[in-house]
């Protein structure tokens, strides 16, 4: 291979170079965490237009896309007439993005629903999903939702928050910003409430629990559309029973594994969500 490569060094020199880069990587990680904290303090934009979509079972509203959860992430997938590969295939870049999306049960466990939207009819969407092995809800656009939310000409990801029947747009990213998405953590960092873990710098009153303890194998989560409502003890017991039922094991879930803080349920978008309050844990 006639390509100019970096020099060959000893193990000690290699380790020293790696540690230098590690320090820079940690700086980037801390900057990323700080940016996500700012994102959680962005003002919200209320969505007051009644957008309609077509799902596999008929017409649905934007509120329906939440599937009862508090948060929604919507990716604009270009699959429609005029797109490369139509009707057999979807946009190559959007297809690559779909291949990268983590198992959605992990997002659901933090009260986040992930959905795709396209102009293609449902018959074509369901066929493509099956052929490509993609999971998750995928809806047909029927109005100007894509134009209103910046995804009529290019792919992009919008984040929303629900408070009762009111829906708010909380963030939007496209172009290279989309390239960083795919993992559970990347989508949670984009969401209005974040990872909901105690180390995060979030506005006071945001739901948070200990890191690691809520993590599960994707088939071991309790089916729960909102992890922040109900009794903590009840949720832990339900998680233990669910694991026993699905794995045949008698392992106990660690304290705080499947729910939020024992102080009670979070009742909606907290006061001060967009005021720059920095009282959350660092």
Regions inferred by a protein language model and the residue ranges of each:
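Non-globular targeting/processing and membrane-anchoring segments
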Residues: 1-110, 127-130, 137, 143-282
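Catalytic nucleophile loop
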Residues: 108-125
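Short loop/edge segments at beta-strand edges and connector loops
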Residues: 118-119, 140-142
């Amino acid at each position: 291979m006639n390509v100019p490569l970096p020099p060959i060094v000893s193990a000690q020199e290699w380790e020293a170079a790696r540690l230098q880069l590690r320090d820079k990587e940690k700086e980037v990680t801390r900057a990323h965490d700080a940016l996500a904290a700012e994102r959680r303090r962005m003002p919200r934009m209320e969505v007051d237009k009644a957008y309609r979509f077509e799902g596999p079972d008929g017409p649905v509203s934007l509120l329906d896309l939440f599937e009862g959860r508090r948060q929604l992430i919507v990716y604009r997938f270009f699959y429609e007439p005029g797109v490369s590969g139509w009707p057999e295939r979807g946009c190559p870049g959007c297809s690559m993005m779909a291949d990268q999306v983590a198992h959605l049960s992990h997002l659901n466990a933090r009260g986040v629903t992930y959905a795709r939207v396209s102009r293609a009819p449902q018959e074509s969407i369901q066929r493509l999903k099956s052929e490509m092995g993609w999971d998750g809800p995928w809806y047909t656009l029927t109005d100007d939702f894509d134009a209103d939310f910046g995804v009529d000409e290019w792919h992009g990801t919008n984040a929303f928050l629900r408070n009762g029947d009111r829906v708010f747009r909380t963030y939007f990213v496209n172009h290279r910003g989309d390239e960083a998405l795919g993992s559970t953590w990347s989508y949670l960092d984009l969401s209005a409430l974040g990872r909901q873990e105690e180390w995060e710098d979030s506005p006071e009153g945001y739901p948070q629990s200990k890191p690691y303890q809520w993590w599960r194998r994707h088939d071991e989560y309790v089916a729960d559309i909102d992890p922040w409502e109900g009794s903590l003890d009840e949720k832990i017991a339900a998680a233990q029973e669910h694991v026993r039922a699905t794995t045949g094991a008698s392992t106990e879930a660690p304290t705080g594994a499947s729910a939020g803080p024992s102080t009670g349920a979070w009742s909606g978008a907290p006061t001060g969500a967009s005021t720059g309050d920095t009282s959350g844990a660092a």
